[in-house]
């Protein structure tokens, strides 16, 4: 009861991590990716350039 997710970079103890939690650290000129509090996936930072 009350489970929001099973697993993923933005899921801990069956709950979504709060919005703004870093789920992927930046590399080089890249930018950090943050959880949005609504999904267990790590959404791509909208301010990044195209994926390479």
Swiss-Prot record:
Quaternary structure, from the entry: Monomer.
Q: List the disulfide bonds.
A: 5-14, 10-35, 11-40, 23-42
Q: Per the Swiss-Prot or TrEMBL record, what residue ranges does the short sequence motif Cell attachment site cover?
A: 27-29
- Briefly, what is this protein's role? Inhibits ADP-induced human, canine and rabbit platelet aggregation by binding with high affinity to alpha-IIb/beta-3 (ITGA2B/ITGB3).
Protein keywords:
Cell adhesion impairing toxin, Disulfide bond, Hemostasis impairing toxin, Platelet aggregation inhibiting toxin, Secreted, Toxin
Give Gene Ontology CC terms. Answer: extracellular region
Q: What family, per the record? A: Belongs to the venom metalloproteinase (M12B) family. P-II subfamily. P-IIa sub-subfamily.
Residue ranges of every copy of the Disintegrin domain listed in the record: 1-50
Q: Which tissues is it found in, per the record? A: Expressed by the venom gland.
Further information: The disintegrin belongs to the short disintegrin subfamily.
Descriptive protein name: Disintegrin multisquamatin
UniProt subcellular location: Secreted
**Do you know which Gene3D superfamilies this protein is assigned to?**
Disintegrin domain
- What is the species of this protein? Echis multisquamatus
GO terms for MF: toxin activity
């Amino acid at each position: 009861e009350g489970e929001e997710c099973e697993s993923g970079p933005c899921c801990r103890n069956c709950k979504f991590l709060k919005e703004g939690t870093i789920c992927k650290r930046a590399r080089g000129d890249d930018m950090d990716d943050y959880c949005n509090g609504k999904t267990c996936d790590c959404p791509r930072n909208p301010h990044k350039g195209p994926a390479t």
